[in-house]
Amino acid sequence: MPKKDFSITIENDSNINHLNVKAIITENEIKYKESDDTITHFNYEKNILIRENKELKMTYRFSKNNKTEGTIEVKELQKEIKVLIDTKSIKRNNYNIEIVFEIEDNHFIYRIEELV
């Protein structure tokens, strides 16, 4: 499986998190490890983002101009929290992806950019 360099940005109204990673590319997914041992999978055919670490597993499904349900699993409590995701836009050019969405009046931008 090929590895490529990517710039990842997760931005909300009060914070911008940015990191550069080496990601594994498959025919429909980008997978990378964040600095805090969070493993992230983004399925770019189905627009599903999964971020998982020891404490949480977050699964967000995006559908352009639609509202979808996402889940946040709190592993220690064995509880699952449902969240409503309002996807404003999805832009994709090869492995460069930008998703603008809202969760409970909080505005987010998730960006994956291939570094050349």
What are these regions (language model features)?
Residues 1-116:
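Terminal leader/tail segments of proteins
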